[in-house]
Amino acid sequence: MNKSTLNNPVFYVSAFVVFLLVIIGATLPNRFGAVAEKLFHFTTIHFGWFYLLAVFVFVVFLITLSLSKFGKIKLGATLTKPEYSFFTWIGMLFSAGFGAGLVFWGVAEPMSHFFKTPFPAVEAMSEEAARVAMGYAFFHWGVSQWSVFAIVGLVIAYLQFRKKRRGLISTSIQPIIGKNKFIADTVDSLAVIATVMGVATSLGLGILQMNGGLKSVFDVPTSIWVQMAIAGVMLITYLISSSTGLDRGIKWLSNINLGSLFIIIVFVFMAGPTVFILNTFVLGLGDYFSNFIGYSLRLTPYTGDTWVREWTIFYWAWSTAWSPFVGAFIARVSRGRSIRQYVLGVLVVSPAIACIWIAAFGGTAVYNDLMNGTSIAEAVNADIAVALFETYQHLPMTTILSILSIFLIFTFLVTSADSATYILGVMTSRGSLNPTLVTKIVWGLLITAIAVVLLLAGGLEALQTASLISALPFTVILLLMMASFTRMLSKGEKKAEQDKE
């Protein structure tokens, strides 16, 4: 660990706060969970409108920016070429973004909406419920969620590679708040805390999901010992990957992830109800586009229904809490892209892959329940972890598909953890693009230790809920980043025009 880390208050403050929260979560999981739940509910009830409006603004801003004259500006020097091939770049975006989550929720979400519909007037498990379920699943995994990551990544990439400044959240809002060390350290500490808590809980929940998959396929018992073994293998794998750097470990894993994802999609598409999947995809896209503004700003103040809070607002809070990590990683791998290319990759290609996955897997599950009288929706309602494997029961080569999916979840989680250790190293090394291996190992060990401790104590979901509370201040920070970026961009463009004259 170098001096830039040891002398950085961000490292000590964030490590202390995380340690404190983990101790509370491990010793008082129920009480901690109740308090975290109450605080999170307070933010979603009173500021749900703010989340929805902010994310909608992000989408409009990014699309407008990409289509404007600023779209051709490079994230780097004018002649800089992209650091990674398009396929590898998309694989990296997807792996850091939400790969492991999509593998499960690609079936679980549409089937959850099919079983309990977003609109009270729509009859559950009907043809109309299926249509609404697919449209809403597309919406939740589409451009809105990615716009949150894209804002952070765009501003940091512009600062790092165009302006040669530190790639920190605090640096990105400096034009608005000025050079205030206390505010800067507070913002960066909050980013580190949210990243550690978010990644650790996702790792823990991913381990539980993998254990569920192993039980479904190989009848491996659900036990803490199995989960600790999975955590140990995962730790060793992502520390080895981390030691090889971005150009080897994460790059290779990302290519494997995206390649495996496409292989599974193609198989399900060919072996499943092919025409139904195609129809579902096209209809789902149509519903997504036609309902985009309505879904983006949907609230239910007249009925008191909680569905939007439980789903849409929860998703936007989750995305915002994760945005410092995912956005910073996206920035790191996007050097050499123009703003227009960046928005196309992050805001169009990545969500499109997600929608294709949902259409293939969610469409197959819906088809079987509607046409063949299966009970996948009921099974998912009882246990979300079985969603994917329950769907595989109605496809050929069930065991091979299940093994491939468990492997894919594992590699996605490893890539996310590896990416997180790198970004945490950057954040706690004053923005250095090459944090030391020791710094990355320290964060890797801490993330795994937190996940295992909370698996033992049963405090994972409490810590996850607590991490989502950070979404409220981060939504404000993201809006400041957007305003700051607009100011920097207009000044930079004006200066460039003057230099030409």
Swiss-Prot record:
Key words, A-Z: Cell inner membrane, Cell membrane, Membrane, Stress response, Transmembrane, Transmembrane helix, Transport
A single GO molecular function term of this UniProt record: transmembrane transporter activity
Description of what induces expression: Induced by high salinity and cold stress. Induction is mediated by SigB, the master regulator of the general stress response.
Transmembrane feature ranges: 9-29, 45-65, 86-106, 137-157, 190-210, 220-240, 258-278, 311-331, 343-363, 395-415, 441-461, 465-485
Disulfide links within the chain: none
Localization annotation: Cell inner membrane
Superkingdom: Bacteria
Classification via InterPro entries: BCCT_transptr
Predominant cellular place of this UniProt entry's protein: membrane
Stored Pfam families: BCCT
Descriptive protein name: Ectoine/hydroxyectoine transporter
Species of the source: Virgibacillus pantothenticus
Gene: ectT
